[in-house]
């Protein structure tokens, strides 16, 4: 079935206005109608990424949006991915592959070249799909970023696509955000805007009506919908760590994750956060690691810098105390590398060349290399004389020499990870390690001999996507939008 509107771009008044969620919902709405739809985001900045079936790397939001379309994600759905590795620099991923590290000024100069890549990927998608739902980045009204823009109106003008603008009413100032954003656009860009969407509304819509009437009168643009605040969508966050859950004293397992400065793929912990038998706590700057059954060191975009940060917080001492008291420790990806004896970066892959002494809890030596491992993987976890299937993915630079026992047998015949001789410390390169209920229960048995409630995380995500689509169908003027 063909869509009446081949492409539509969702831009926002701010970051976290609801662009990713709205695009996911629109994708599911169109997919329900039998339309061959795909998501697209020209430029994304995120440390939470996903691996595509063709061995590339894209923003996680586009992987979720592809799921909403009932299709597999590809690198062309997010042709430019920026992964910050310092306050002023980032690794640039182009069509799924690492290009180089750039500072902000260098990337600004490179954007003219990047636009060609963006338009190439968009062209490929338009030939394969009937409808493309496009997500902008941040706000189109950032004056200092408008020159050479490839993320918002610069792309919309180049690709000649219509735009809707979404704002989050929950943070306040929604009318100023929408009116001001439109006012800061050029005349041709304003003409491109079909209307507004207000997101995360709570209360009586009748009390909002006078404001909606004012906005439409002042701008000449319709408000296409007011979407309710949807709690507990259970979709993977792209940037911000999900707010701390309320802790329950009667749970079976307490898990603590130290928040590193460049923490990446913290979506690994969503399945733990959503399990009613698990308390998941994030420990931040200046806080102690305490009252844990399991400490997990997460992935990071800057392993050596974050290892130094971990030590500066005294978390290395907290971890040693935890082990002396019989607790368990895991490391995922960069966190796994930290648990080893040494991390060498002779070529300056992550910054200045050099070596760092790890925590020394696993007999593992890592050398960071320029080539990045990007694979989807299935494996068998062998732990405490039991086995469980694991599905995950690898996103890392570096190769590790492992002298400890390796608990994971990969589907390609290789082994992954390490477990200490004492049996209390384990590491793996696999993200998504806990998503399989069988593997999660094997881990919880290893930690403290308990089993937790089995939940299918994919089912929870599907429920969240469908709730968004239901709200869009109920509260948005889709006839006007897609006429």
From Swiss-Prot:
<feature type="active site" description="Nucleophile">
    <location>
        <position position="333"/>
    </location>
</feature>
<comment type="function">
    <text>Catalyzes amidations at positions B, D, E, and G on adenosylcobyrinic A,C-diamide. NH(2) groups are provided by glutamine, and one molecule of ATP is hydrogenolyzed for each amidation.</text>
</comment>
<feature type="active site">
    <location>
        <position position="431"/>
    </location>
</feature>
<protein>
    <recommendedName>
        <fullName>Cobyric acid synthase</fullName>
    </recommendedName>
</protein>
<dbReference type="InterPro" id="IPR029062">
    <property type="entry name" value="Class_I_gatase-like"/>
</dbReference>
<dbReference type="InterPro" id="IPR047045">
    <property type="entry name" value="CobQ_N"/>
</dbReference>
<keyword id="KW-0169">Cobalamin biosynthesis</keyword>
<dbReference type="InterPro" id="IPR004459">
    <property type="entry name" value="CobQ_synth"/>
</dbReference>
<dbReference type="InterPro" id="IPR033949">
    <property type="entry name" value="CobQ_GATase1"/>
</dbReference>
<dbReference type="GO" id="GO:0003824">
    <property type="term" value="F:catalytic activity"/>
</dbReference>
<dbReference type="GO" id="GO:0009236">
    <property type="term" value="P:cobalamin biosynthetic process"/>
</dbReference>
<dbReference type="GO" id="GO:0015420">
    <property type="term" value="F:ABC-type vitamin B12 transporter activity"/>
</dbReference>
<keyword id="KW-0315">Glutamine amidotransferase</keyword>
<comment type="similarity">
    <text>Belongs to the CobB/CobQ family. CobQ subfamily.</text>
</comment>
<dbReference type="Pfam" id="PF07685">
    <property type="entry name" value="GATase_3"/>
</dbReference>
<dbReference type="InterPro" id="IPR011698">
    <property type="entry name" value="GATase_3"/>
</dbReference>
<feature type="domain" description="GATase cobBQ-type">
    <location>
        <begin position="252"/>
        <end position="439"/>
    </location>
</feature>
<dbReference type="InterPro" id="IPR027417">
    <property type="entry name" value="P-loop_NTPase"/>
</dbReference>
<comment type="pathway">
    <text>Cofactor biosynthesis; adenosylcobalamin biosynthesis.</text>
</comment>
<dbReference type="InterPro" id="IPR002586">
    <property type="entry name" value="CobQ/CobB/MinD/ParA_Nub-bd_dom"/>
</dbReference>
<dbReference type="Pfam" id="PF01656">
    <property type="entry name" value="CbiA"/>
</dbReference>
């Amino acid at each position: 079935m063909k869509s009446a509107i081949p492409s539509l771009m969702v831009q926002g008044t701010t970051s976290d206005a609801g662009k990713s969620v709205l695009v996911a919902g629109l994708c599911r709405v169109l997919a329900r109608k039998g339309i061959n739809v795909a998501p697209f985001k020209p430029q994304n900045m995120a440390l939470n990424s996903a691996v595509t079936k063709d061995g590339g790397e894209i923003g996680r939001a586009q992987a979720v949006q592809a799921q909403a379309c009932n299709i597999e994600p590809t690198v062309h759905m997010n042709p430019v991915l920026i992964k910050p590795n310092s306050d002023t620099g980032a690794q640039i991923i182009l069509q799924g592959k690492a290009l180089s590290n750039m500072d902000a000024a260098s990337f600004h100069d490179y954007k003219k070249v990047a636009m060609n890549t963006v338009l190439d990927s968009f062209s490929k998608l338009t030939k394969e799909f009937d409808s493309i739902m496009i997500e902008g980045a941040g706000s189109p009204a950032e004056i200092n970023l408008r020159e050479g823009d490839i993320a918002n109106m610069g792309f919309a003008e180049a690709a000649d696509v219509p735009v809707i603008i979404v704002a989050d009413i929950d943070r306040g100032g929604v009318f100023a955000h929408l009116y001001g954003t439109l006012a800061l656009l050029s005349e041709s860009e304003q003409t491109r805007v079909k209307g507004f969407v207000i997101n995360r509304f709570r209360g009586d819509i009748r009390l909002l009506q006078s404001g909606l009437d004012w906005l439409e009168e002042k701008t000449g643009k319709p408000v296409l919908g007011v979407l309710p605040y949807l709690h507990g969508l259970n979709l993977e966050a792209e940037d911000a760590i999900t707010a701390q859950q309320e802790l329950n004293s009667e749970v079976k397992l307490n898990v603590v994750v130290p928040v590193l400065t460049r923490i990446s793929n913290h979506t690994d912990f969503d399945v733990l956060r959503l399990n009613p038998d698990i308390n998941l706590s994030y420990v931040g700057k200046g806080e102690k690691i305490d009252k844990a059954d399991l400490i997990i060191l997460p992935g990071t975009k800057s392993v050596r810098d974050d290892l130094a940060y971990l030590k500066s917080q005294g978390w290395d001492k907290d971890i040693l105390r935890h082990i002396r008291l019989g607790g368990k420790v895991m490391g995922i990806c960069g966190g796994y590398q930290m648990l080893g004896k040494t991390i060498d970066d002779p070529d300056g892959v992550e910054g200045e060349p050099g070596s760092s002494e790890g925590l020394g809890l696993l007999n593992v030596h890592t050398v960071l290399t320029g080539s990045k491992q990007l694979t989807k993987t299935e494996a068998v976890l062998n732990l405490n004389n039991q086995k469980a299937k694991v599905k995950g993915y690898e996103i890392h630079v570096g190769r590790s020499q492992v002298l400890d026992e390796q608990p994971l047998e990969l589907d390609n015949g290789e082994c992954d990870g390490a477990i200490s001789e004492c049996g209390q410390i384990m590491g793996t390169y696999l993200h998504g390690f806990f998503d399989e209920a069988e593997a999660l229960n094997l881990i919880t048995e290893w930690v403290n001999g308990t089993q937790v409630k089995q939940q299918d995380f994919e089912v929870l995500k599907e429920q969240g996507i469908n709730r968004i689509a239901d709200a869009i169908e109920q509260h948005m003027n889709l006839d006007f939008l897609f006429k």
